[in-house]
């Protein structure tokens, strides 16, 4: 059973993936999204979290991608927790700008450094998205250093 359950969203612009950096817990890049509140559906959660994290944006054409589980990312190596992410993908309407606890918005691509990513993204999400052709990167062009060897 996971210690944390979150909902995340995959937003692409060309071959770039929208990721965020928070101001607490980890310096790694994360998917936009968060924890559902009582009575919220996953899609309600995504709408709320996107407004809180990225300002006046909305999500269109949302579809479920999959659920992934791995260790959560913390800068403190003594903290060991498990994270489960229900991942969706959709089209963003509006310009994302850092808000609330988000300090940076990054368009991550095949030329970006995989060391910036969280364990769940490296170990579970990225390999699945590449194998299913959801990310428009070939394994040859996947983020370095060689993501498959991590």
PLM region spans:
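Conserved hydrophobic "DFG−1" position in protein kinase catalytic cores
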Residues: 11-12, 19, 90, 107
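Active-site-adjacent beta-strand/loop module that shapes the phosphate/pyrophosphate-binding cleft
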Residues: 69-96, 128
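Conserved Nudix-box catalytic region and its N-terminal flanking loop in Nudix hydrolases
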Residues: 16-56
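NUDIX/MutT-family hydrolases
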Residues: 87-89, 97-130
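Conserved N-terminal beta-strand and adjoining loop/helix that marks the start
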Residues: 1-17, 35
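Charged phosphate-binding loop/patch that engages nucleotide di/tri-phosphates or the phosphate backbone
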Residues: 117-150
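A short coil-to-beta-strand element that immediately follows conserved catalytic motifs
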Residues: 57-67
């Amino acid at each position: 059973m996971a210690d944390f359950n979150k909902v995340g969203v995959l937003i692409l612009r060309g071959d770039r993936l929208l990721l965020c950096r928070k101001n607490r817990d980890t310096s790694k890049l994360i998917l936009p999204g968060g924890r559902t509140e009582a009575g919220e559906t996953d899609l309600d959660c995504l709408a709320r979290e996107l407004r809180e994290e990225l300002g006046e944006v909305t999500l269109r054409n949302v579809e479920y991608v999959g659920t992934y589980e791995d260790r959560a990312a913390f800068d403190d190596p003594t903290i060991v927790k498990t994270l489960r992410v229900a991942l969706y993908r959709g089209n963003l309407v509006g310009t994302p700008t850092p808000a609330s606890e988000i300090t940076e918005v990054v368009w991550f691509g095949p030329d970006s450094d995989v060391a910036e990513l969280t364990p769940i993204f490296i170990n579970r999400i990225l390999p699945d998205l590449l194998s299913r052709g959801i990310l428009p990167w070939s394994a040859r062009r996947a983020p370095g250093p060689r993501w498959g060897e991590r």
